[in-house]
Amino acid sequence: MKIAVTYNKEQQLRPLEEAEIIGIIDDEKKVVEQYENPAYNMSKEATMSVILDIGADAIVVKNQFLCPGSYMMSYGRLKYIQTQYNSLQEVLEHLNELKSAATEELNEEVYAEAYPE
């Protein structure tokens, strides 16, 4: 399984458009391939397009990492792995437990847009 993870240069997990790096964890080869995110500071949809083009099977997400558009782009094409972890290292340390919790869909609050109150 190839699992996409979006993070910054300090390897802290970030929403799609804030991620400087797209990591692809290849759990069979036990490696993380890193790609510079060409859609950094653009949009979540642009980053999702890159992830889909790379050929990921799943993506690690936290609340508001996705938006309705990027979720719809990936729905049926990726599995979703929700996490409370904050860094690539933590994801790697808990990869087996995270993989076992992969789902085909997300609750709306995970991908809903954040609106200031």
State each model region's role.
Residues 40-43, 64-66:
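Short beta->alpha connector loops
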Residues 1-42, 53-54, 80-117:
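Non-catalytic interface/targeting segments
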Residues 52-89:
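Mid-chain, well-packed structural core segment of small domains
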